[in-house]
């Protein structure tokens, strides 16, 4: 069952343009809380991928992070690379330049 929180997360993620990433922390803070892990939980059950591009959400240090295991992490990396994002050693290259921050 989808919660109001899930819907709010999905609506925010749809705002992240191709070629950019955001973080679990950015999403949580934009929603007015610090529930970073709850954001990850919502994205793990995203029924609208890739329309809701959860592959564009990464860790706050620029690491690509989990995506349901190694095979799925490789899929996430491939999707990001297809959008022009360079990844080196599991991290977004030029992370600060690629980081999408939601307006307040």
PLM region spans:
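Nucleic acid-binding interface residues in structured DNA/RNA-binding domains
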Residues: 1-104
